[in-house]
């Protein structure tokens, strides 16, 4: 009986310590990690679609870059979130799923235009999110992650601005 009580107490202490660990992550940092994970899932999913549906070679190549780069970003944010005890979503947000569906309905050069427009606006928001974390985040590790991936978002924004010009999506 005492052994069972001791085991139950230990399990409860472990559960509470992991809960306290997750709750000790400031709201801004937690939101940034969750938003970054959703964004990475979105980019990977949309990039895979662009790899197959892209009309131009440039749109398909941009899709490949998104899958490659945002897969690395996803692994980094997952590792950081795990170390901080933050539970991340396993896919894009509901709004992002809607954007994927709407963009995917286009075909040919219309797909390329819709994809370029979507990604230009998305990467502008990614840069703003990274800037916000760098400015407002409390924990050093999420701030460093934001700083690291801000450069990638800027490169991606340049890719999609060029694609938008090529496919007359401006």
Write out the residue ranges for each language-model feature:
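His/Met- and acidic-residue-enriched segments that coordinate or traffic transition-metal cofactors
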Residues: 2-8, 17-170
């Amino acid at each position: 009986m005492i052994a069972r009580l001791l085991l139950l107490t230990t399990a409860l202490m472990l559960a509470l310590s992991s809960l306290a660990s997750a709750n000790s992550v400031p709201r801004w940092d937690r939101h940034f990690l969750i938003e970054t994970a959703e964004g990475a899932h979105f980019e990977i999913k949309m990039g895979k679609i662009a790899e197959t549906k892209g009309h131009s070679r440039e749109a398909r190549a941009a899709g490949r870059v998104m899958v490659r780069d945002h897969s690395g970003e996803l692994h980094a944010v997952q590792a950081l979130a795990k170390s901080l005890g933050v539970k991340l979503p396993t896919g894009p947000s509901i709004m992002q799923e809607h954007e994927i569906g709407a963009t995917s309905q286009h075909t040919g050069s219309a797909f390329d235009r819709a994809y370029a427009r979507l990604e230009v606006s998305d990467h502008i928001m990614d840069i703003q999110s990274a800037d916000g974390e760098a400015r407002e985040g409390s924990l050093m590790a999420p701030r460093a992650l934001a700083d690291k991936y801000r450069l990638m978002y800027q490169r991606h924004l340049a890719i999609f601005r060029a694609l938008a010009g090529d496919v007359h999506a401006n």
